Curated annotation (Swiss-Prot):
This is Small ribosomal subunit protein uS14. Pfam families: Ribosomal_S14. Keywords: Metal-binding, Ribonucleoprotein, Ribosomal protein, RNA-binding, rRNA-binding, Zinc. InterPro entries: Ribosomal_uS14 (IPR001209), Ribosomal_uS14_bact (IPR023053), Ribosomal_uS14_CS (IPR018271), Ribosomal_uS14_sf (IPR043140). Part of the 30S ribosomal subunit. Contacts proteins S3 and S10. The gene is rpsZ. It comes from Rubrobacter xylanophilus (strain DSM 9941 / JCM 11954 / NBRC 16129 / PRD-1). GO terms for cellular component: cytoplasm; small ribosomal subunit. Zn(2+) binds at C24, C27, C40, C43. Its cofactor is Zn(2+).
């Protein structure tokens, strides 16, 4: 769980565009972020197992 200061820092407008980075909308994690869902890998996995993300299911072959 990121500190509140890090989340506030990320939300501020950056002077340079390259300094901007994505955070998980659910937990605030900055690493392993999936743009398509706006979530980190951990939250994506949890929600997918609960069936809360339409069209996502566990692979089986």
């Amino acid at each position: 769980m990121p500190r509140k200061a890090l989340i506030a820092k990320q939300q501020r407008k950056q002077k340079y565009r390259t300094r901007e980075y994505n955070r998980c909308q659910r937990c605030g994690r900055a690493r392993a972020y999936y743009r398509k869902f706006g979530l980190c890998r951990i939250c994506l996995r949890e929600l997918a197992h609960e069936g809360k993300i339409p069209g996502v299911k566990k692979a089986s072959w």
